[in-house]
């Protein structure tokens, strides 16, 4: 299970308050419905869910990793959130939402297009009339960025770590290593890049109309790291 040992160090590795605010701002700009209901998939440590809850939205925050959910539940601002462990490729919550979010390139953790298709189908069943799905995913530029090995090293609470990232074909491989109490803890993550047209075709087949931005607010054809896909019923 990924995000097990890593959950303890996740925020120290990737927390970006400015980016969290930009994700929340984008969500508000798209929804334009204060106080509406939102389901977040792959919420991680729930930074974005907590920020949206502070802005008055009703959040259910879900993730496959219960270790990450436990990390999220302990945060200030998490008191008003509902949490649930959930596999985003297939779920049935017996309720619907005004919006579903899947941020931080979480969709790139899915193993293939069939899993993505299954996710979109599950999302469609959980959206209210005129509901919205918003997610981001890697662009081809992101693959190119790690065509040469990237290594980050440092200390988190006196625990040495190393994070290695490298592109292999259409995948980005992450290797995390932590040296704690004389032991090395490791996690290996694989993210897969998907063709944007394939993704849009599957969304259209589910009845969504789509808009694509790059890096929050640029045109679809602009260079950048992330596609932001806005899919509306």
What feature does the model see in each segment?
Residues 134-202:
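SAM-dependent methyltransferase
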């Amino acid at each position: 299970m990924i995000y097990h040992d890593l959950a303890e160090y996740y925020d120290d590795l990737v927390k970006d308050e400015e980016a969290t605010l930009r994700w929340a701002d984008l969500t508000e700009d798209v929804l334009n419905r204060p106080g509406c209901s939102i389901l977040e998939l792959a919420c991680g440590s729930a930074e974005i869910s907590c920020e949206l809850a502070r802005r008055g939205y009703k959040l259910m925050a879900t993730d496959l990793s219960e270790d990450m959910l436990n990390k999220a539940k302990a945060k200030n601002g998490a008191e008003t959130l509902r949490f649930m462990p959930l596999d985003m490729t297939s779920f049935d919550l017996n309720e619907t939402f005004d919006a579903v979010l899947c941020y931080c390139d979480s969709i790139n953790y899915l193993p293939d297009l069939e899993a993505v298709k299954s996710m979109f189908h599950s999302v469609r069943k959980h959206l209210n009339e005129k509901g919205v799905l918003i997610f981001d995913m890697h662009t081809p530029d992101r693959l190119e960025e790690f065509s040469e090995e990237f290594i980050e090293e440092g200390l988190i609470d006196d625990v040495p770590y190393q994070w290695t990232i490298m592109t292999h074909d259409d995948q980005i491989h992450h290797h995390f290593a932590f040296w704690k109490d004389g032991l090395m803890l490791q996690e290996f993550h694989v993210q897969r890049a998907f063709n944007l047209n394939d993704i849009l075709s599957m969304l259209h087949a589910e009845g969504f109309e789509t808009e694509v931005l790059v890096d929050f607010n640029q045109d679809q054809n602009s260079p950048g790291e992330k596609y932001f896909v806005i899919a509306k019923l």
